Each structure stands twice: as C-alpha cells, then as structure tokens.
Amino acid sequence: LFESYCASILATSALGVAAFTGTGLLPEGFTAGDMQLRAMFLPVVLAGVGILLSVAGVFMVRTEEDASQKSLLKALARGVDLACIGVAIVSLGLVYWMLPNFLGVCVSIITGLAAGWLIGKWTEYCTSDEFAPTRKLADQSLTGPGTIVTAGIADGMRSVWAPVVVVVVAMILAFGFAAKWNLNDVTWFAMGLYGVGIAAVGM
C-alpha cells in the first residue's frame, strides 16, 4: 500500500509538470515554471494533509467496552467519513491556492475520494459477518469443506465487479473534470491525465 501510494504521488507530480510544458494552459501572470512547481507539489501536500486527517479520524473512533461487530464497524465508518469530509474541504482550499484557474482538479480529487469510499463500503459488505455474503458462505460449511472452498472462490470472483466499475467511472469523471470536458482539445489531454493521477492520490 505504501509503495503504490508513493508511486501515485510521484506519477501525478510528473504528469503535473508535463501538463504545463506548453503555454496553452498558462494563466495570465504565471510562468510555465511556476505552474509546474505548483502542479508538482499539490499531490505531495494533499497526501501529507490526508495522512494528518486520517490520524485525526482515528481519534474520532469511540467504542464501548463490550461493543458488537456492528457498532465497531459504525465507529470505524465514522472516523473514515470524517477524514473524507476533511480531505474534501482541504482539497478545495489547496487547489484554489495552488491551481486557482483549475478548480476542476478539486472535483477530480473528490471523485477519487468518493471512489475509495465506495470501494471500502463494498469490501465491508462482502467481508463482514454482519451482511449476507459472509453469512451465506458460513452456511456452506454445514455440508463440508468442498462446498465452502468452492463458494468462497465464487464469492471472491463475483465481488470484484463493483470496484472495477467504480474505478473506471472515477477515471472517466476525473479526466473530464480536470480537462474541463475539452475532450477534443489536445492541450487539455495532459491536464485530464493529471486529474486521473490526483484522483488516485485522493483515493
């Protein structure tokens, strides 16, 4: 996880530099070097803020001594939700400060954030004993190890469709928002790729 997160930060920084190599996207009063530095440091700053807010979210988790699995999941969800809301708010301020003419990048960040949140909820549904898939799988053990192994493999294969759909939709939306939906303009293509990268950092 750490390696993939660092890779997404570095890749997004590189895409940010590439997006402002020409003069087509430069706002008035900014040089290419200014915008490249801002686009390069945005994912780094966003990741740092996200880590701090995640730590703060951990301290928001409160449970009772003999809490059930359901109440534990709710407490964890509360911490995650608060951290996500915090990142969304801070990202708006960061993008407004660092890339003021490209607020679509903020929407790309929120898109990635929402995609990560949805995938987390789906994972919880597929793996928690509070929900139907795991309970049905437990019932398979009554007939022996063969059926539970087969059912487990089938459930695992079946569970990946939602994350795939969410990631594909998030990529399309992140690209479009960052590129301001100028899909036929080559100048904005690199900015769209930057949006996909920054969405991965937000995720």
Can you say where each PLM-predicted feature lies in the sequence?
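Hydrophobic packing and interface segments
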Residues: L1-M203
